[in-house]
Amino acid sequence: MPALGKIFVTGTTGNQGGAALRNLLKQGFHVKALVRNPAVARLDHQENLEVIKGDLNEPASYKQHLHECDGVFCNLTYIHGIDKEIRQGFELVNVSRENNVKYFVYSSVIGSDLNTGIPHWESKNKIENHIRSSGMDHTILRPSSLYENLLIPQVKSRILKGKLVLPTKKNTVQQFISSEDIGKITTTIFLNPEKYRGKTMNLASEQMDGEQLAATFSKAMGKKIKFQQLPTFITRLVMGKDLAKMFRWVNNNDACFVKDMQALKNEFPGMIGFEEWIRVHFN
């Protein structure tokens, strides 16, 4: 078992938490997976996997399980409210510190520190700052857009019918990464805590505009996929004010924060390319 042997993981039924869980187990870590409903989570029985029933809204439901943990991987969602996300993050940091957790890895979002006015970016910056002030050894990850966002049923169904419909303009350049790579990077950090202590890392493995995304889909799927921009008023109506504000910002600003992507790929070899990812999930 690695030196930081026991890792507490949140969001294990989601993309990032699930990827962290899988990759940590592959490398011999003991994982404590926090879930609200183990029966619904349906996590396979695996050696070194301990499923913990608890709720991030109720620290008393999970704090005793942090006592023997060496590390925490934290990924939170804002979908139940920004204030709730911030409170969950602060409380998990506080309880981790009280239980002498040695290392805290937080998956935030790229651009969280830029005063964009995007609520679910700025909430994560508050959690980042609370982690820094906690005194715990830590690494903060700032992933770019996830490939997995393209698996949202409404998006995927349109792609399968020949249209990539997104709120971004056709020439808006974005950076992307897979959740699986975030899980691999998280595992590398826990294997090498001295190397990554105190670092804040922007993460991306691909950079494309809307038309390039559609062209890559066309190549990987062997059929024509056309890009189409979702009108702003529909974005706001369907996705809400927060995401509409985010896409408006992305459409009007430089959202490419990883300036040396090759250096990142050299640091973390084997990152998944977009075409490779499409072939796995759309064929």
Predicted regions mapped to residue ranges:
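A hydrophobic C-terminal alpha-helical subdomain
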Residues: 232-283
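Oxidoreductase cofactor-interface core, primarily capturing Rossmann-like NAD(P)-dependent enzymes
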Residues: 2-46, 57-60, 67, 78-84, ...
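Short glycine/proline- and acidic residue-enriched helix-loop micro-motifs
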Residues: 75-78, 140, 261-264
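N-terminal Rossmann-like NAD(P) cofactor-binding module of classical short-chain dehydrogenase/reductase
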Residues: 66, 70-73, 105
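Cofactor-binding loops of NAD(P)H-dependent oxidoreductases
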Residues: 54
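Electropositive phosphate-/nucleotide-binding environments in soluble metabolic enzymes
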Residues: 18, 86, 121, 180, ...
